[in-house]
Amino acid sequence: VYHSAAIVSFLKKDRDIMYKINIEGTANMVNACLAENVKKIGFISSVAAIGRNKSNTYTEKNKWSTNKDNSHYAITKFKSENEIWRGVQEGLDAVITNPGIILGPGDWSRSSTTFFKSVKKGLPYYPVGKNGFVDVRDVSNSIIQLTKSKITAEKYIIVAENSSYEKIFKTIASSFKIPQPEKKATPFLLEIAWRYEGLKKLFSSRKPSITKETARTSSMINIYENNKIVEEL
């Protein structure tokens, strides 16, 4: 069984349903697999579930640390991973992957593919942060290979490249043959932006283009090491 279903949202209004689906949904999936004697479950989590620490460099050995830098999405993915580990303790074979920001074909109105929509519209700014990125095909291929293998009770970071948002946004713009974003969206500017978007939301049903969580996470420098998956797969 491959379990990749989850809500990815940084909007306050989505938190209750995100906690319910991401955590309870995974618990239900684990219970069903145990009840039906499923051979193995492959769970696609996220690098967000690794948490945040002061080093800004992460491997699979990092321990979760509760702090203000963890988004609610990250918390739900961490807790959903715990449901997988519960299943392992109860006799279920399982493997977990932790992809970085996934890029590839998809619905531009959802999750990380909104990058394409934003840049295509003529985004003038780029965040100053850095993060791990990966092609959706690498994500799918890795979980298939790991789930079919004899590997169990392990987790793997799936990141092709640690890149700045500046590079990613400019590459996307170049592919569209449109002007590249040239202005830095500093943490200070983003703090103003998410508050402004919050005020606009009071008078409109439109989703804010930036939230408190996305403003802060996009300013962070996060480096993810992929040595384990490269060496073992």
List PLM regions with ranges.
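Substrate-positioning beta->alpha
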Residues: N28, K79, R110-S111, P127-T147, ...
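NAD(P)-dependent short-chain dehydrogenase/reductase
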Residues: E90-F133
